[in-house]
Amino acid sequence: EIMPSLVGSEMCIRDSSSAKFTTLVSDNYPAKLKEISCPPFVLYYHGNLSLVDKKSVAVAGSLKPSEYGKKCTELYADELAKKEDVIITGMQEGVATIALKQAMKISDKVIAVLPCGIDSYYPKQNKELYEAMCKNGLIISEYPRKLEVKKDQIVQRLRLVSGISDKVLLTETETKSKQHIIVSYALEQGKNVYAIPSGVMDKDFQGNNDLIKMGAIIVTSPKDITDLSDIDIKDLDNSEIDMEM
């Protein structure tokens, strides 16, 4: 049952662009992804696949962050890039895009996981970022060619964002934010989850404070992520995390 789909995938990739692919039985398939639930059998990519083997932090957060959230994201992405951590995001608008753009000012150690075909990009305003990362960085997807994005794929790619990371950082989120779905995947995969606290008077962005109450590791400085990296993950209660988009 696997081989026909693999053959079909090979035909797709041969008929498309310069994208490459690896499979679950290939020597260069990311070891971290082999450890997650339901790893993609075929992984398509543009760029430097060896980045998945380096120390890394997945950055997630609001699609429409506040000025505070934007500044926090820029600060942490900047400092982590200077520490040679690979920055990983799903390339969504907002926090994810801000983190990638800031990190690329320092380093080419950036990874984006797409919810669409490897030869496309999402959201559409990230065309220049996509093209830059294909040359300097890494773009990966479990979908071939220009397959259009679907609602369930937006959620599914978060398991890969978390899966290839060593830890997950949320810089700013709303209450019951859909970005909390990555927390569920991180817990399932045994990854540490870090959250930057928001102001108690900011009623629009209490999501991170809620995560901290549930057991996420609070960070108030970029160096906290490195200093606390050996702490075992806490038993977050993810029963309240909505897995539906």
Named regions from a protein language model:
Residues 20-245:
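Glycine-biased, small-residue-rich flexible motifs in mid-sequence functional cores and linkers
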Residues 1-8, 12-13:
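Single conserved hydrophobic/aromatic residue that forms the stacking wall/gate
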